Amino acid sequence: MFNGAVSLLFLFLAVVSARADPTFNDDVLGLIVFKAGLDDPLSKLSSWNSEDYDPCNWVGCTCDPATNRVSELRLDAFSLSGHIGRGLLRLQFLHTLVLSNNNLTGTLNPEFPHLGSLQVVDFSGNNLSGRIPDGFFEQCGSLRSVSLANNKLTGSIPVSLSYCSTLTHLNLSSNQLSGRLPRDIWFLKSLKSLDFSHNFLQGDIPDGLGGLYDLRHINLSRNWFSGDVPSDIGRCSSLKSLDLSENYFSGNLPDSMKSLGSCSSIRLRGNSLIGEIPDWIGDIATLEILDLSANNFTGTVPFSLGNLEFLKDLNLSANMLAGELPQTLSNCSNLISIDVSKNSFTGDVLKWMFTGNSESSSLSRFSLHKRSGNDTIMPIVGFLQGLRVLDLSSNGFTGELPSNIWILTSLLQLNMSTNSLFGSIPTGIGGLKVAEILDLSSNLLNGTLPSEIGGAVSLKQLHLHRNRLSGQIPAKISNCSALNTINLSENELSGAIPGSIGSLSNLEYIDLSRNNLSGSLPKEIEKLSHLLTFNISHNNITGELPAGGFFNTIPLSAVTGNPSLCGSVVNRSCLSVHPKPIVLNPNSSNPTNGPALTGQIRKSVLSISALIAIGAAAVIAIGVVAVTLLNVHARSSVSRHDAAAALALSVGETFSCSPSKDQEFGKLVMFSGEVDVFDTTGADALLNKDSELGRGGFGVVYKTSLQDGRPVAVKKLTVSGLIKSQEEFEREMRKLGKLRHKNVVEIKGYYWTQSLQLLIHEFVSGGSLYRHLHGDESVCLTWRQRFSIILGIARGLAFLHSSNITHYNMKATNVLIDAAGEAKVSDFGLARLLASALDRCVLSGKVQSALGYTAPEFACRTVKITDRCDVYGFGILVLEVVTGKRPVEYAEDDVVVLCETVREGLEEGRVEECVDPRLRGNFPAEEAIPVIKLGLVCGSQVPSNRPEMEEVVKILELIQCPSHDLE
């Protein structure tokens, strides 16, 4: 309060001084008033002083020498916050105003463009919000350049924009603008650069674009535009870059594009364009970047591409192209990257690259993933030494690896997996000093793994599985200190596992299964603290498995097939090792008393043998007694602790078990390593009807407590008959137990018997989202709480998808709210337990979500179910959270489907009907509308039209308006 009074007093004195002293002009007053509305944490504006009547010396200010008035104000990246005050309207001679890359908030003042001299306005990179006022462009005078990019502006583009006939540069990218482009936008005949990318704009591009003869750059990417690519775009003869990627454009490329003779970049990826790639594409001689990926182009690659001598980046991936790659591509000597993966190419597709007539090449990336054919890989020639990424996987290549492929010393990634390559791995492999990924898996390679592999010191992933490699694993592999993945499975490797592997501290994944490895496991592997997967199954490994840490939870399937391996995992005890008996040398004799000594030796040997026999008998007798006592103790201990803890769970009417003579003992695993975690003294109350929290398709959830009093939730699974084996169950549990995210419920452990499986996870005190939305009518979530919940669910799902886990069952009852109001996704990963029964269970309703949440692809057996089904469920959840209504509700004579109701309301402009009436209008429309639209997009009937959850998170973070506090 005191500071506010001082600021007002200061401004009053400034105004009085201005009236009293004619030298104190409007510029000084305007700048001081503007500064008063800012927070300047770095004191960048310390030189702005009302006692200094000459602002021309102030930081960021530039004056016109003719008038001695401020003509430029540049405060970009000053770390300023606050709002853009009206004081700047006093700067009548200002022609450049740059406030970019700060943290300014608030809405746009429609009067700024009215400054008669103003030519450049740059407010980009701030946190401005609200709509662009209709009056912002109505009297734009001599305005030349406007950038409002990277803010949080909402609403539609004002029609008044067409009045700014002098505008040459317009950038409204990376906001939350929606609606259609104004039809009169192409009246801006002076436009040279237009960027509307990364918004929510939609509809067809209006006619008239071809009238912008001076247009150099246009970027409409990452929107929801549809229809055809404008047919008159070729009339923009000055165009240098065109980006329409990540939209919904369809149809063929318009022939008028061949007139874009000055264009250097064409990006059309991620649309639904069809037809063949036209021959005239090779007539755009200035092209440097051509990206037509992720469309529906068919036919062959035109030979005319070889005419593009300046081409640097060519991406034709993820189309339906066929035939061969034209050899004319070798004429494109400036190519840096080419990606033609995920097509149907046949024939000799590499000849153009390996028989180039250039002495040098700048090619650094080549990808030809997934195509059909059985060609040989031609020798790598020297002009490809700049290659950094080479992906030739899944192509049916035959022959040997090129002996000189290792001269590609710049390679970061080499993938030749899933071909029919044979022969040995060249010893020059060590020349790949900077390579991070080497994948030669699923081939017919033989011979040994050369010790020179240790020269590839930057290697992070080594995939050589499914080959015919023999010999030993070289100890020098430990030189590759960055390795996190080693997969040598399904080969013919022999010998012992080198102890040097234990020095690879970053290792997370080791698979040496299905080889002929022998010897004992080196003790050094116990040091590998980051291990997630360790598989040595089906070898001849002997000795004892390590104990403790990761190896406590290793599945039986990871070590099975090693008959001489012992330890708790294989349920085989390790025999004690006794010192060898002393053997006397019978040839050591004294010539003087040979016979006597011989007899003495015999007596000694006999006595030693007798002692050994007696000792062995005693050891056996003691061992039998000890084992008996230990068994008695162990049985009583198990019954007191683990068995009591687990079997007590069957007490109560919902856990009644049929009597059996042989009591079944289970396996209890807590990922924290805690022992005796359950308080078993009150077994009757551990899991019974009174402690039940809820029921679902997979089982019943109960609340109980650990011995230290911490509450946990325990789920009794009801899908026991569908789970294949204990090993698969435990493997999946360990994967789920490693997941840690604030928006995902933590799995703490599990319990297994053949007839009973329990999941132990954290107890979330706030209950389900369903209860918060549809439970107590007197409780109403605020908008801020609802937005936080939506964002939390999105982040949790994105995390699960990044961990290759699909939920399959997104609904309000599977989202829990903790005491802090944070959303946590629960009940995830359970479908993975069902293995081959998954499809049957999905279609029978075991995994399906409740009514209204189920993605339409579940009803079609021919459609692959992917993680996009979760995106659909999320979209329905978003609408449920915003509206407060269930996905499907029943009226007297009708069924109301939420998604359809919201879509109709939004299209008809009845936004208030799309938001929970209990909020009584207390919500920011600039947040609510984009959130609703996002929910509708996520709930699209077509899986490919739904965004990925990672993208959804980014969109929500853009939508969020921290300046609004509507609690």
UniProtKB/Swiss-Prot annotation:
ATP binds at L693, G694, R695, G696, G697, F698, G699, V700, V701, K715. InterPro entries: Kinase-like_dom_sf, Leu-rich_rpt, Leu-rich_rpt_typical-subtyp, LRR_dom_sf, LRR_N_plant-typ, Plant_RL_S/T_kinase, Prot_kinase_dom, Protein_kinase_ATP_BS. LRR repeats lie at residues 91-114, 115-139, 141-164, 165-189, 191-212, 214-236, 237-260, 262-284, 285-307, 308-332, 334-356, 384-408, 410-432, 433-456, 457-480, 482-503, 504-528, 530-552. Residues 687-959 form the Protein kinase domain. It comes from Arabidopsis thaliana. The gene is PXC2. The lineage of its organism: Eukaryota, Viridiplantae, Streptophyta, Embryophyta, Tracheophyta. CDD domains: STKc_IRAK (cd14066). This is Leucine-rich repeat receptor-like protein kinase PXC2. The protein kinase domain is predicted to be catalytically inactive. Glycans are attached at residues 103, 127, 171, 219, 296, 315, 331, 374, 415, 446, 479, 487, 516, 535, 540, 571, 587. Residues 21-609 are extracellular. GO terms for molecular function: ATP binding; protein kinase activity. Residues 1-20 form the signal peptide. Leucine-rich repeat receptor-like protein kinase that may play a role in vascular tissues development. The keyword Signal applies. It is found in: Cell membrane. One of its GO terms (cellular component) is plasma membrane. Expressed in the vascular strands of cotyledons, the shoot apex, hypocotyls, roots, leaves, stems and flowers.
